[in-house]
Amino acid sequence: GSDSGQGYKICQKYNKTCKEKWFSDEQPVHKVKLDGYHLDIYEITQDEFKHAIGKDPSEFSGSHLPVENVTWFEAKKYCEHIGKRLPTEAEWERAARGKNNFVFWWGNKADSGKANFCDAQCEKRWKVSQLDDGFSYTAPVGSFPPNNYGLFDMAGNVYEWVSDWHDEGYYRNSPLENPQGPKSGRKKVMRGGSWINYPTGVRPADRTDSKPNARMDFVGFRCAL
């Protein structure tokens, strides 16, 4: 996790109606020890998904665009089909942070040259007009620089499903080694932010959730091993 005050401060810069409680599930800040693992360099593309599953549910069409509009169950099925799995939330965040502890993987200031979020080209009323990443919706995977682990789009483009159930207070009692998330729940965690978010949503610490059977044109995934 990270200081939820950071998220609140950034959100306030672009939206004065932000509330600090929106970021409470990022607390408390805690250290976690993880065994070794591998994470896909890119978000799963529409081509990859269609080749493996036989269909492409995406709202935005493009072979090198990330697949979106996929349920958590479909993401899990795809990863298992190719001999992998969805990453845990802890694995995902560790990889997203890169080799530092900044607010964003690249530093402490929002930068439209580093991630696809809702800025000048975005058609939502809450867009951040003073920044411009050049995309209105999803971007082809790898369009932005990788973090210092060599991973692309860990910030923005599409949210990514992870394996964990969401629990507002899980961080207060989570294991210090290889946490797997709560044993049950109603909603699954999504990480990384997307083309539809304020910059605050693309921080490595940001957490959100949705029902596992939900389909959204701003949610995709990548696999782990």
Across the structure, where does each feature detected by a protein language model lie?
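Short, compositionally biased
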Residues: 1-55, 99-100, 189, 218-225
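Functional-site microenvironments in short loops/helix caps that host divalent-cation chemistry
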Residues: 3-19, 58-208, 212-217
